[in-house]
Amino acid sequence: MSEHGIKWACEYCTYENWPSAIKCTMCRAQRPSGTIITEDPFKSGSSDVGRDWDPSSTEGGSSPLICPDSSARPRVKSSYSMENANKWSCHMCTYLNWPRAIRCTQCLSQRRTRSPTESPQSSGSGSRPVAFSVDPCEEYNDRNKLNTRTQHWTCSVCTYENWAKAKKCVVCDHPRPNNIEAIELAETEEASSIINEQDRARWRGGCSSGNSQRRSPPTTKRDSEVKMDFQRIELAGAVGTKEELEVDFKKLKQIKNRMKKTDWLFLNACVGVVEGDLAAIEAYKSSGGDIARQLTADEVRLLNRPSAFDVGYTLVHLAIRFQRQDMLAILLTEVSQQAAKCIPAMVCPELTEQIRREIAASLHQRKGDFACYFLTDLVTFTLPADIEDLPPTVQEKLFDEVLDRDVQKELEEESPIINWSLELATRLDSRLYALWNRTAGDCLLDSVLQATWGIYDKDSVLRKALHDSLHDCSHWFYTRWKDWESWYSQSFGLHFSLREEQWQEDWAFILSLASQPGASLEQTHIFVLAHILRRPIIVYGVKYYKSFRGETLGYTRFQGVYLPLLWEQSFCWKSPIALGYTRGHFSALVAMENDGYGNRGAGANLNTDDDVTITFLPLVDSERKLLHVHFLSAQELGNEEQQEKLLREWLDCCVTEGGVLVAMQKSSRRRNHPLVTQMVEKWLDRYRQIRPCTSLSDGEEDEDDEDE
């Protein structure tokens, strides 16, 4: 192989780079990637189109179904010169027309008859193009799908394209028409498709002239008349159509350039469900793909089949829609093993990313000696009151998908830690719900953001702020931590002293935990998070570590109140958030929106409007003992009355008619962040569309069958 042959040419600047280069040396453009996704080749009658293609070039001798655009692959030699040789030039405007055109496409001038001395090659009539190799990725694009159209018959009711062996439409169950009607319908569609393909190729011009060459079918009289009428009509809007095609082509190219291997495998699996190809689903599963993944707007646009694909659809939705019972059994098994969940952050990834950017923009660092990071916005997440308007079966499905039932059971039934007061949970509408989140070391950060903004800390924005605050304000937090640990040990009768080096080693370990994504966090990190939020954090948790046999191993020390004591009180909010702790896992505890009743609590006239939701969070446990306040200094430590006084200074407290000391958490849908409100509405719309009488496994009816 020569030196020229082993190099790859850049698709932007045409510079020839060495094979080891992953980017262009001149313009730094990314090296084009090859074919990624393959599936079994179609068994069509027009398989001779790709006869010169070697199946061994792809894995398993299969041909690709969905792959990146041809612009993202290494360039192949174009057949542009061959196409131009077969075209005839108009004697009026010199436009190069297709050989079968009897009039000029641009000026509609009559084609001149061939001169007796003119060679067949120059005129283009009667000459046959030389066979060439077809790009496998372009063999199955929209233009070459004309060759496989004979395998399908179109339903006369819903226009769905069914396979040839289907006796009735798989969407609407309409019986297949007789052979004469089917042939006429197929001919009509083929004629219109040919017209559209000619139009597309003409407006793309030289940009698309290097694509796969097609063999033209014999032109009938009816086709000629239709094409002539179509050409006359389209000339008026030619410029606008060309610009729209160019914009659409550029947009699709940008989307394809952002796609990764997993994305192509997912799209291939979606098409595999529609076409009945189980191998595509197996390929996606074997790559570690998420079965519950949903289609985005860009992916739907790339698939370009609105009748089959819609935003938010999963593989399960598609299997139900197209009645793939064998695939549905496999997919539902996978989803059940993953204990499928659907929280608001999962429904709309685009809104979730915008919320993450809002959080990052609202993080600022305080100037001065105490250079701690803080959030500028006060946001409290609550479950929408519209949930109660849903049918009972739909409500049960919603709670199964958004709540952590195991945590809820452990905090409510196994130990009376939350919702133990009937007065708070029922009469005052302050029942707490444990939201599901990732069961990893990031659960504390996830639960904090879920209790405020309703999303995960996926990009570790909050973890980075936590680490930077601990590092920049290390002296302040270290002093509080050291004094608290010494007092806590002495309160249990453990009288010991550590060298300063040992204290420093333990503190360095706490700092290292904050910088490692996925690392479990401790009480000190909750104390720092209270300063970042500028609001108190109340943790309701189990008191003891237990083994798998149920044996008590030690105290957990997480339950209690964490106040932002190092800030000024005027700089902080008094509305707290609540977290739950069970066996090494944190969960966000949120309430449901209520009507904002007045005069709730003994002598407490709230004087609030109906839009404000007030949740009463108990500051005592089920035994009516005051919750511990963590990280108090020696001057702030005292008896229970002094700690209650401190709580009243940092929280809006009141006593209910039952004598329970509570803190008021206030939230308002109208004053909440609009992105959070929009995300919750989109999530709730998913359940509003579910019919209560459904018998489908995923709880959704196929609402669009009649629109197909």
From Swiss-Prot:
Biased composition (Polar residues): 209-219
Pfam families, sorted: AnkUBD, OTU, Zn_ribbon_RanBP
Residue ranges of the TM segments: none
Recorded superkingdom: Eukaryota
GO terms, biological process: cell migration; cytoskeleton organization; positive regulation of Wnt signaling pathway; protein deubiquitination involved in ubiquitin-dependent protein catabolic process; protein K29-linked deubiquitination; protein K33-linked deubiquitination; protein K63-linked deubiquitination; regulation of cell morphogenesis
Gene Ontology annotations for the cellular component aspect, listed alphabetically: cytoplasm; cytosol; nucleoplasm; nucleus
Keywords: ANK repeat, Cytoplasm, Hydrolase, Metal-binding, Nucleus, Protease, Repeat, Thiol protease, Ubl conjugation pathway, Wnt signaling pathway, Zinc, Zinc-finger
ANK repeats: 260-290, 313-340
Annotated residues for binding of Zn(2+) 2: C90, C93, C104, C107
Principal place of residence: cytoplasm
Annotated binding of Zn(2+) 1, by residue: C10, C13, C24, C27
Coiled-coil positions: none
Residues annotated as catalytic: C443, H585
Function: Ubiquitin thioesterase, which specifically hydrolyzes 'Lys-29'-linked and 'Lys-33'-linked diubiquitin. Also cleaves 'Lys-63'-linked chains, but with 40-fold less efficiency compared to 'Lys-29'-linked ones. Positive regulator of the Wnt signaling pathway that deubiquitinates APC protein, a negative regulator of Wnt-mediated transcription. Acts as a regulator of autophagy by mediating deubiquitination of PIK3C3/VPS34, thereby promoting autophagosome maturation. Plays a role in the regulation of cell morphology and cytoskeletal organization.
Quaternary organization: Interacts with TRAF6. Interacts with APC.
UniProt comment concerning the protein's domains: The RanBP2-type zinc fingers, also called NZFs, mediate the interaction with ubiquitin and determine linkage specificity. RanBP2-type zinc fingers 1 and 2 (also named NZF1 and NZF2) specifically recognize and bind 'Lys-29'- and 'Lys-33'-linked ubiquitin. RanBP2-type zinc finger 3 (also named NZF3) binds 'Lys-33'-linked ubiquitin and shows weak binding to 'Lys-6'-, 'Lys-48'- and 'Lys-63'-linked ubiquitin chains but it does not interact with 'Lys-29'-linked chains.
Family as reported in the entry's similarity comment: Belongs to the peptidase C64 family.
Stated name of the protein: Ubiquitin thioesterase Zranb1
Taxonomic source organism: Mus musculus (Mouse)
